[in-house]
Amino acid sequence: MQIVDKSFQNFDKFLEISNEEGAFALINKPKTWTSFNVVNKLRYATKVKKVGHAGTLDPLAEGLVLVAFGKKATKEINNLILLKKRYLAQFKLGATTKSYDSEFEEENIKDTSAVNLKIIQELIANNFIGEISQMPPDFS
């Protein structure tokens, strides 16, 4: 099985590898697309029958989706999902929305001028380290 990087220029060779050995590619999912949209578009564009992804990103999130091409690669997806992941997030302080994301208009707007990096780091260290159980919002 092969992992190709952005320097890999031979698309026909990629398709050959996908069908014979299986291959993985990191795809930058745009905002509003679902991970399933990415898979469907790639399946259609490449004509590879077996295409799958190793984890769902929220439609409002932008980010990398690991996409498996070919039967051998898609069989490995369940093993990959169990691996540890790291996330990088951007957030805005001082407002809420009905959906807890950018889908609805901001409300309850507060002044955040007194907030600094030290305060944020302390809040994270005291509240968001280790295993966390959360209740999903009504809009999810």
Report each predicted region and the residues it spans.
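Catalytic/RNA-binding core of pseudouridine synthases
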Residues: 1-140
